[in-house]
């Protein structure tokens, strides 16, 4: 294992919420969204004309009032999915014998250290092995399918019952990885 390094916050872009502007006041609705990002505009609480009610029930796509309309629910589900899909995610990187590996090891989360060590040991034994360790799962990096289908043999190694392998199978047509699931540690 290795030390986890704290990121430098100065390296991250500034967070600038899409606040409601004075020009929007006449046609403001709580669920109006930025067309590029799908993110709703933020109204500062307490300002006249910008009332917004939060809660766990489905809301009307425009007014923000509670809605039980099936068409509205369908629209809201799609709007939320589109918003998530627009999140910019860096490509997954391949380490090791990236260009000519016979085996690609795939993992995510806290598996990096031992998967990297396993790859290095296999390389020392003369095997052509690569490692793709995922940091972003939803949305997946845009190059995921290209990376996973490049290799003849792919094994997804997990410290659970194989949920990530199942997720990848669901997201990528005709992807049939081998699985190595270790629950006991």
Set out the residue ranges of the language-model regions:
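Flexible, low-complexity linker and terminal segments
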Residues: 1-185
């Amino acid at each position: 294992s290795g030390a986890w390094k704290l990121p430098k916050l100065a390296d991250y872009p500034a967070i600038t919420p899409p606040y409601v502007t004075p020009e929007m006041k006449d046609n403001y609705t709580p669920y109006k969204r930025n067309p590029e990002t799908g993110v709703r505009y933020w109204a500062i609480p307490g300002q006249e004309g910008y009332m917004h009610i939060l809660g766990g029930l489905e809301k009307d796509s425009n007014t923000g009032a509670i809605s039980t309309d099936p068409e509205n629910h369908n629209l809201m589900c799609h709007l939320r999915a589109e918003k998530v899909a627009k999140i910019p995610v860096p490509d997954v990187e391949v380490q090791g014998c990236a260009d000519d590996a016979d085996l690609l090891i795939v993992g995510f989360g806290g598996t990096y250290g031992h998967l990297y060590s396993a790859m290095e040991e296999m390389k020392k034994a003369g095997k052509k092995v690569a490692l793709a360790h995922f940091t972003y799962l939803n949305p997946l990096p845009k190059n995921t399918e290209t990376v996973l289908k490049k290799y003849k043999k792919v094994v997804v190694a997990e410290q659970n019952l194989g949920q990530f392998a199942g997720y990848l199978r669901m997201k990528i047509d005709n992807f049939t990885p081998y699985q190595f699931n270790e629950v006991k540690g």
